Design a protein with these regions (language model features):
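Flexible "arm" and connector segments at domain edges
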Residues: 1-89, 93-150
């Protein structure tokens, strides 16, 4: 069975992204932060103070993600922190899956649809690259429809 990790690794390789490339890893970190801000934007809180904190966090983290994705800032995980980073990334997967489970979201199917949509970003096996190295979307590309999975 091909895992989501394997599909993502193959997709990045097809896009010309290489393990150990400082620029590629920095852009990927920026993309990861951008996705987290998208998650934060879905949250609602029952206090004005909490809403302000979430809004500030979205603004600040979104700003940082854009700086990183554009190449204005280069970030990296130093070797002595990689075990901690791996643990945090795995914990992020576990807690994200837990949220989906508790909200009765069909994460298995959603993962496959999102990965299929990413595959559709390749045109004749080649990526559309944006300035800064982020993978773009070809004309006519559509995001995965997840509306029936919630």
């Amino acid at each position: 069975m091909i895992t989501n990790f394997d599909r993502t690794a193959n997709w990045l390789e097809n896009c010309g992204k290489q393990p150990g490339n400082p620029f590629d890893t920095s852009v990927q970190i920026g993309c990861h932060l951008e996705e987290f801000t998208e998650f934060l934007s879905t949250l609602r809180v029952d206090s004005d103070g909490g809403k302000l904190v979430i809004d500030r966090t979205i603004a600040d983290l979104g700003w940082l993600a854009n700086k990183i994705k554009s190449g204005a800032y280069m970030v990296y995980i130093p070797p002595h922190e990689r075990t901690n980073a791996l643990d945090a990334l795995c914990d992020g997967d576990v807690t994200g899956n837990g949220i989906c489970y508790l909200y009765k979201m069909d994460k298995r199917t959603a993962d496959q649809r999102v990965l299929d949509a990413n595959d559709a970003k390749l045109v004749d096996g080649k990526p559309v690259l944006l300035p800064g190295g982020k993978i773009g979307k070809p004309e006519g590309w559509k995001a995965a429809d997840l509306t029936d999975l919630i």
